[in-house]
From Swiss-Prot:
Protein name per UniProt: Arylsulfatase K
Encoding gene (name): ARSK
Main location per the UniProt record: secreted
Cofactor, free-text remark: Binds 1 Ca(2+) ion per subunit.
Post-translational modification: The conversion to 3-oxoalanine (also known as C-formylglycine, FGly), of a serine or cysteine residue in prokaryotes and of a cysteine residue in eukaryotes, is critical for catalytic activity.
Organism per entry: Gallus gallus
Amino acid sequence: MGSGGPLLLLRGLLLVGAAYCAAPRPPRHSSRPNVLLVACDSFDGRLTFYPGNQTVDLPFINFMKRHGSVFLNAYTNSPICCPSRAAMWSGLFTHLTESWNNFKGLDPDYVTWMDLMQKHGYYTQKYGKLDYTSGHHSVSNRVEAWTRDVEFLLRQEGRPKVNLTGDRRHVRVMKTDWQVTDKAVTWIKKEAVNLTQPFALYLGLNLPHPYPSPYAGENFGSSTFLTSPYWLEKVKYEAIKIPTWTALSEMHPVDYYSSYTKNCTGEFTKQEVRRIRAFYYAMCAETDAMLGEIISALQDTDLLKKTIIMFTSDHGELAMEHRQFYKMSMYEGSSHVPLLVMGPGIRKQQQVSAVVSLVDIYPTMLDLARIPVLQNLSGYSLLPLLLEKAEDEVPRRGPRPSWVLSEFHGCNVNASTYMLRTDQWKYITYSDGVSVPPQLFDLSADPDELTNVAIKFPETVQSLDKILRSIVNYPKVSSTVQNYNKKQFISWKQSLGQNYSNVIANLRWHQDWLKEPKKYEDAIDRWLSQREQRK
């Protein structure tokens, strides 16, 4: 960050705001725009509009809202890092990419939207976190996902905690993210400014994802919300909402499993919950400042008025809503993502209420680059919802559906999960659609998702389930995932040979496992002896 810090950056952007608004909108058939996508990790989309935006100062997101459009109902297609990013980079739903968990993503040679833009004349550049190809993440993460059908219940995460570092002068807390942000800024100022062709720039950030905790001891995994006093002062404590929790005995069975494996079934004081949420919001403020660095670099090089900017996240963060932290859930805190777009031709100060999802980014990028949109994509271009003038609309395939789909097949959840979101309803079903009860929430009357009304509205459940089955044969997909998990675990177990017992006893669940290791090994053996699920 420059010597003046975020405040000076913001003042500079406020001064250029009028000039940006007055900049002429390039005609539809003029040179193609530059495109920038900033994708962070674990950012709750509800913080980008009222009332969530009252909780923390996010000046650069607000700048994008004033000079562009914000989507009020944007969702991840899978609330976990790799599967979500696989959907975003491929334009395909998770059951089509078969990115079932954080270890299984796209093939390295898969043609992404950025590959096509490069093929059609764009100069492309990527910095930071990508995380959409196979073979990443820890052994613990893989094994926990593969064994979620085993009949045992083990804590897989550390109890969420906070950590305050530095003083009021400590701005750059997440050093890795600031380093890649600096690289992107340098590239803009030294390389992009001299290009004779349009560019597509991607910046991937780790924040506001919780930080890793010590592997051994009472806390392990990635459960630390870390920030400095500088960012914590951006949070309005009086506006922090303490979530209402359902009693453990009344929780949906999948929610209870998630809460237990995330180590959240113990006692938490209101002060603990408030601090966890405050530290998370402070991490969001630091993320916003990195976005500001990029916007300022574009302004300094006179590229801002020539560039379409998108800001989003792979998923959200529950931050102790529904007695959980992390993601891996279809509740709003986890599945609702930010999506803001600004640039030449984009409507300003617009709030878009249509339901959209991350698979829509692929066709949108192709539209921006004047590349014919592939017909097999799961997503639809966002441009018809964004462009200032009707004549600017690009040819597209059929009407946008009135729903979005999200699905989850990874760790911390013991059943494949499918979510269909419409304008009013959120329908969540599991596994084969029979063995686990569904959930239905009326988000217009119950935005906190505290009352499952599936029994009260059986016709709505039936109607939404019919739509869902027309999109995906989810019982078959669930069976496919179960068989995949078992085969992967068997292969991993065989690769360890005599070391299997020692290795599995030292994964993230080691504290619970070591209490009764024989019991848990026997449970795995029973699971392995069961017949393969029919597809």
